[in-house]
């Protein structure tokens, strides 16, 4: 299965280690995985994937806001209606983590994506274990 892993860190920086671990877990199950950085790339390639996994961090500790790059990349990826997807949120703080995950799923569903799996990622090893469960 062709899977796109969209990396949406809270601030513009390189792809975090937990996103690479998630992709590594998916690849170990035989999937073809591409990591897309939401801060530097556009979403024009997204409709070509069978499954889309969004890995995000909350932009603020209070209120669970999502980074500005998330709605931008999802809006550019036209043709996402009905696309199966997963929402992964990196736990950065014990406060408002559920609200941040709900905001992530709301942004994805706004573009018509079907979120059939959501999870809070605790670290790189946890992300790799989650990646092995996709498509199983």
Q: Would you name each region that the model predicts?
A:
Residues 2-136:
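FMN-binding flavodoxin-like domain, especially the glycine-rich phosphate-binding loop
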């Amino acid at each position: 299965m062709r899977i796109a892993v969209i990396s949406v860190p809270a601030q513009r920086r390189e792809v975090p280690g937990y996103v690479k671990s998630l992709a590594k877990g998916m690849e170990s199950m035989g999937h073809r995985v591409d990591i897309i950085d939401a801060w530097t790339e556009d979403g024009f390639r997204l409709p070509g994937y069978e499954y889309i996994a969004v890995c995000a961090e909350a932009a603020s500790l209070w209120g669970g806001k999502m980074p500005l790059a998330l709605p931008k990349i999802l809006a550019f990826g036209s043709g996402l209606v009905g696309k199966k997807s997963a929402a992964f949120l990196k736990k950065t703080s014990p406060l408002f983590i559920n609200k941040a995950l709900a905001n992530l799923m709301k942004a994805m569903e706004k573009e018509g994506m079907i979120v059939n799996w959501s999870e809070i990622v605790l670290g790189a090893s946890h992300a790799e274990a989650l990646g092995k469960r996709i498509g199983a």
